[in-house]
Amino acid sequence: MKRIAASALFSAELLERLRRLGGRIRDARVHRRLRQVDLAAKAGLSRSTIEAIERGEPATSLGAYAHVLWVMGQDREIDLLADPGLDRQGIALSFSSVDKRVRPRTRLDNDF
């Protein structure tokens, strides 16, 4: 199976946000006077994974990003990701919909 380039899968805005996150993680590591190999050892990850995180690579797992943040004591704001209380669009949509179950709008064609 052919791999699809990240630029084809992700928006330029998202890729830029990941690059900025990687830069902030790199800055946090440097402020703690940790080399990449030191952070990799503390996190139980490879140095190449730390490099990928610091570049903001989208193919690197969310778990790896979160674990590195945790190792450096920077994981507190992870709870804010996809927080239903902060999802203005989701809240607005929930008030406009009476039905709480998610169902397909049309009947699925199971005839294959």
What are these regions (language model features)?
Residues 57-70:
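Short, basic-rich loop-to-helix N-cap that marks the start of a DNA-contacting helix
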Residues 25, 36, 47, 62-65:
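Helix-turn-helix DNA-binding elements, focusing on the entry/boundary residues of the two helices
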Residues 6-31:
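A short, Lys/Arg-rich alpha-helix, primarily the initiator
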Residues 23-38, 100-106:
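Short basic helix-loop element that most often maps to the first helix and adjoining turn
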